[in-house]
Design a protein with these regions (language model features):
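Inhibitory N-terminal propeptides of secreted protease zymogens
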Residues: 43-181
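Bacterial Sec-dependent N-terminal signal peptides
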Residues: 30-57, 675-683
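Substrate-binding/access-modulating region of protease and related hydrolase catalytic domains
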Residues: 37-40, 232, 236-238, 247, ...
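Acidic-leg catalytic submotif of subtilisin-like serine proteases
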Residues: 152-155, 220-293, 309-313, 317, ...
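Surface-exposed or secretory-pathway low-complexity segments enriched in glycine-proline
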Residues: 600, 610-640, 668
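Hydrolase catalytic cores
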Residues: 311-314, 340-345, 369, 373, ...
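Flexible, small-residue-rich helix->loop connector segments that border functional cores
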Residues: 230, 245-252, 265-278, 299-304, ...
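Protease zymogen maturation seam
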Residues: 117-132, 146-241, 249-255, 259, ...
Length: 683
């Protein structure tokens, strides 16, 4: 019995009840230490742990009458042939079929559809070996799992279960409730001409934070993603697709409709027919995996507008004279990145873990390069990478498929997955903490961690996610402003790591758009590293304490006492705060340095361009850049240059290097901000 029990998987947390027996511990180690994106389920020469029997805990909250089975590589061909011959009631593997008979099985079907043009990718990642077994729901799940796991050709048996919402953000606060008198005004604050004519852009402090205390307080200038200067180089590209795995996105929204991904074959096809042969019917704007239908919904009871809010941060239409801006929403010329709605929540309906895998497969097959995930398990439900691999084998397999599968014509030879860290003010939740994905924490308006944000060593990067119980005036304006449902006035404030996460997804989408513009391509691990390197320091801001209004989280029942010690968060919020301009410069292969306004900053050019002992340097600044930044400089004999800027902004300068013979001219990006970290902007 030990061998069969070791193949049974189950989970006993709030979201999905399943437990995975995972033999490939060596792959977990590689992933944990190196962030490897290879599929752990497909690696060879892993240690055999079959002798170590695992205790079966419970299957009480798993979906009755259903189990997920992964067959061995050696047996899968026979299974495929057997299932085809028997119309999905038998596999052709006698011991397994005998077990099916004992549990009164009614069907055996693949978790993902068979689609000819994508089948090679499915087989490369091993997703084709996962099957869903349905049987009499009066049969004990535990007993059925034991019987199937006893078959030698079965690698894993996993309980399936429903995925519950983990949106502990506050309810949306309509824009008009906060700024009832100036919805249609464009406040330029410092007399500057805004980049775009969207009237609410000036309230999106998370894009450009001028430290304006009439907006909200406390607030610090520069606590933003620095997207405005990035828009001078790129605003988006419609060939880049971001899959929003969330509630349904309101594809008719006035500020989103033009940037929605559209499956033209289904849009122009017949209702109820899989017109493009991709295995999904009527998937015009994505697919509703919560209800297993093509129609994306957002008007069911308990829908919150969560997915629509997330989508707006990434790609609300820019420069259209209405509403808000999206990070990669284009310039008003139908040039924003596209949003694909991967709906896993719909009112009282929710996806299962196996349908989530199907959803990730769909997003991959239909060309999405970025998977935006503001959902996940509660903090503490899973406490280690090893436990995650033990309990969510099929999900890890699907992530690897998304990351490693190439999309035709994409500047990224694979994909990137970006997750919210969670909102319990504890350890980062899973899957966000899993090394293959990017884990995003949340910052308030002043570089301090948001009251609710999860944190810890698995955190990769931080972004603005707002705060509610912290601010003294216009407290709602300290949250993130984006698109929502009509019920909430089409635009509203929300806060949470669900709101910080799409800032990173939006910047990543902007980076891929710029790569497309420049004709560059990147490998998944290379691009991920570029995203994580495109940051500004936050640890220097984490001193003393932060006070806020004590509250109790209605979703978890956890009480918060109103005091945060900032030292606790140092080195625990990720490498830094995402910077959109630095992201584009990384794509451009141009080093970027930040200088403080009216503060002389010494830069060592040799750090970027070679050994100062062998090379000489000359800085060249155009009149346009000098005037734009108020830039003056002096050069030193040791390969340094001291730069002073009197105006905030960005500019490109030239650095000419010479070794006594040939000369090479290279770019250096100068970013001038009002305030910078104590380390002079270096990371």
């Amino acid at each position: 019995m030990a061998g069969s029990e070791s193949r049974i998987v189950e989970c006993i947390n709030l979201m999905v009840m399943k437990k995975v027996y995972w033999t490939l511990v060596a792959i977990f180690v590689a992933a944990a230490l190196g962030g490897c994106v290879n599929d752990p389920t497909e690696m060879e020469n892993a240690p055999d742990m079959s002798a170590g029997s695992r205790k079966i805990l419970t299957s009480a909250e798993a979906e009755a009458g259903e189990l997920l089975v992964k067959f061995s590589k050696e047996s899968i061909a026979a299974v495929e042939a057997g299932v085809t011959r028997s119309e999905s009631t038998r596999t052709g593997i006698q011991p397994f079929d005998a077990a099916l008979k004992e549990i009164s099985a009614v069907s055996v079907e693949r978790v993902i559809p068979v689609v000819e043009q994508h089948e090679a990718d499915a087989r490369a990642s091993g997703l084709h070996r996962w099957y869903r077994v349905r049987f009499n729901d009066q049969v004990s799940l535990d007993e059925a799992a034991r019987k199937l796991a006893a078959v030698e050709d079965v690698e894993v048996v996993q309980y399936d279960g429903y995925v519950a919402r983990n949106f502990t953000e506050m309810s949306a606060v309509p824009y008009n409730n906060v700024w009832s008198s100036d919805r249609d005004q464009i406040n330029t604050r410092s007399g500057e001409t805004p980049k775009f004519n969207d009237p609410m852009l000036n309230k999106q402090w998370h894009y450009k934070n001028t430290g304006d205390e009439t907006l909200v307080s406390p607030i610090k200038e520069g606590c933003d993603i620095n997207v405005e200067p990035a828009w001078e180089f790129c605003t988006g590209d419609p060939s880049i697709i971001v899959a929003v795995m969330d509630e349904g996105v309101m594809y008719k929204h006035e500020d989103l409709a033009a940037n929605m991904w559209v499956n033209q074959a289904e849009l122009n096809g017949q209702k109820g027919v899989d017109d493009d042969g991709n295995g999904y019917v009527d998937d015009v704007y994505g697919y509703n995996f919560a209800k297993d239908q093509g129609d994306i919904t957002w008007t069911d009871p308990e829908d919150s507008g969560h997915g629509t809010h997330v989508a707006g941060t990434i790609s609300a239409v820019n420069n259209n004279g209405i509403g808000v801006c999206g990070i990669a929403g284009g310039s008003g010329n139908n040039d924003g990145v596209k949003i694909m709605s991967i709906q896993i929540f719909a009112g009282r309906y929710q996806s299962t873990i196996s349908r989530n895998v199907d959803a990730i497969y769909y997003a991959t097959s239909m060309g999405a390069s970025i998977l935006q995930c503001s959902w996940g398990l509660m903090s503490g439900a899973i406490n280690s990478d090893e436990q995650y691999l033990d309990e969510r084998s099929i999900e890890a397999n699907a992530f690897a498929h998304f990351i490693n599968t190439k999309r035709p014509g994409s500047p990224l030879n694979g994909g990137i997955i970006i997750f919210a860290a969670g909102n319990e003010a504890g350890a980062c939740g899973y899957p966000a903490a899993y090394p293959s994905v990017v884990c995003v924490t949340s910052l308030s308006t002043d570089f301090t961690p948001s009251v609710f944000t999860n944190y810890g060593m698995p955190a990769d990067i931080a972004a603005p996610g707002g705060d509610l119980y912290y601010h003294k005036n216009h407290s709602d304006a300290g949250q993130v402003l984006s698109t929502v449902l009509k019920l909430d006035g089409m635009y509203a404030y929300m806060s949470g790591t669900s709101m910080s996460c799409p800032h990173v997804s939006g910047v990543a989408a902007l980076g891929l758009s710029y790569a497309k513009q420049l004709g560059k391509t990147f490998e998944p691990d290379e691009f991920r590293d570029m995203v994580l390197a495109s940051v500004n320091d936050i640890d220097s801001h984490l001193t003393g304490t932060k006070t806020y209004i004590p509250y109790t989280d209605s979703a978890t029942g956890i009480g918060y006492d109103g005091l945060m010690k900032m030292d606790t968060y140092k080195g625990q919020m990720g490498i830094g705060m995402i910077d959109a301009f630095k992201m584009l410069m990384a794509v451009r292969s141009t080093p970027a340095v930040t200088v403080g306004q009216n503060k002389a900053t010494k830069i060592s050019l040799g750090k970027y361009y070679g050994d100062v002992a062998r090379l000489t340097y000359k800085l060249s600044v155009s009149d346009e850049v000098a005037d734009k930044l108020g830039l003056t400089y002096t050069t030193g004999e040791d390969g340094t240059v001291e730069i002073t800027c009197t105006k905030q902004g960005v500019g490109l300068v030239s650095v000419e290097t010479s070794n006594g013979g040939s000369e090479v001219s290279r770019e250096l990006a100068i970013i001038c901000r009002a305030k910078i970290a104590s380390n002079g902007g270096w990371l």
